[in-house]
Structures are given as C-alpha cells and as structure tokens.
Amino acid sequence: ELVILNKLKVNILGYLMNKTFLAIIPARGGSKRLPRKNILDLCGKPLISWSIEAALKSKYISKVVVSSDDEEILNISSNFGADIIKRPYELANDTATTFDAIKHTIDNFEKYDYIVLLQPTSPLRNEKHIDEAIELLEEKQADAIVSVCEMDHSPLWSNTLPKDGNMRGFLREEILNKRSQDLEKYYRLNGAVYICKTDKLLENKSFFLKDNIFAYIMDRKSSIDIDEEIDF
C-alpha cells in the first residue's frame, strides 16, 4: 500500500512539473479600511512580501506577478523577486473586480496552464499550502481548487434580527438541545489560495466553476486575513 502511495505521489509530481502555473498577487494602492495595508510592516517585512516569498518557494509556480496601480508597491514587490505589472486606473478603482486584474495580467504574459491567485492579505499561507493545493488539483483531476477553513462558530447558532431585537424563531428547533460538538462542521472561504485552469477561468470569469471544483482545507491559524489594524 505504501509503495502504491509513493508511486502515486511520484506520478502527481511528474505531471505537475510539466504544467505551468502563473501566480498572481493583486495589490491595489488604495485601501479604505487600512490605508497602504499591502506594504505595512508585519514582523519586519512588508505584508505583500510574505505572499511573494511563499510563491517563489513553491515547487510548482513558474512565475510570480504582482499587479498594482501603485509604484511603491510595484518597487517593493520587484525587490522581493516578483515580476510586476502596472495596472491602469480603471482596473484599480472601487468598481473594478479581481478578475479584471487577473485578465489584464494574463493578457500581458505568455500563456500558462493554470492561474494561482494569492491575496496579499493572507501572510500565514506558505509554500506548503500552495503546493498541497496544487497537488490536490491533480489528485482530484479538478479544474479548480479553492482554499477554505473550518468556521470558528457554527452558522446554525446565528440568524438575522428584526429592528426590535425579537428573537422568536432565532434558532431552528432541531438544534436547540444540541451540543456544539455534535453539529456538522461548516467551512468558509479563507481567501488564501485560488487555482484554476486558465481557459476555464477566462471562460467563466470566476474561480467558482459550476463543476469539478474542490476545497483545499487549511487550519484556522494559517487562514488569518489582514483587513484592519487590529489584525496586525
């Protein structure tokens, strides 16, 4: 059984080494909640550098590109070893989507088999996570992989509230006498790793394909997302 498992790993590794993966790190200069967050210091390094270094250490990533409208972000990213592309203003304003930035990057580089999106706000996602997600892609013969983590609290304990705060019907009857540990596990997107076949991504304009998409499960600690000053 161990021999079969090792052969499978070798086959996966061999297949993936023949595929090309373009890692894209989108980093706008403007951030409403936390200005300049992508280059704020985190343990002695700019926030974005954690994602750049993780991608560069990956066994499978062919090229790492930072897309930004901001010269300082681009200069810092280049110093940490990433290729850079200047994003035009219309693709970096509040109405522009992440896909707009991805499409702009794809159009300006040679063709790659897969796109790997790495948000710079996930500094604890490292090369091990990236490589495991890519290996899962081949293991599942998937078109797309998206990272998730287990939720801190079950959504079954939550609900909306009316203006007067009335809690009638707040919880479903079937969970009223259940312990938390007896409830099904729920998972949430953690924003750390998105992978998709390039053709499928361009066709669907999203990593969330209708079929043949699987979750890569990460631990909650590695899923930390930097969004506000308190997160630092």
Predicted feature locations:
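A conserved hydrophobic position in a structured secondary element of the catalytic/binding core
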Residues: 68-69, 125, 195-197, 218, ...
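A residue-level structural signature of the nucleotidyltransferase/glycosyltransferase Rossmann-like core
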Residues: 122, 193, 215, 223-224
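N-terminal amphipathic/basic-hydrophobic helices that include classical n-h-c signal peptides
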Residues: 1-16
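Conserved core of the sugar-phosphate nucleotidyltransferase
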Residues: 95-100, 114, 123-211
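Short phosphate-binding loop-to-helix
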Residues: 65, 71-116, 124-128, 132
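N-terminal glycine-rich phosphate-binding loop and ensuing alpha1 helix
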Residues: 20-67
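Catalytic donor-sugar/metal-binding loop of nucleotide-sugar-dependent glycosyltransferases
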Residues: 205-216, 221-223
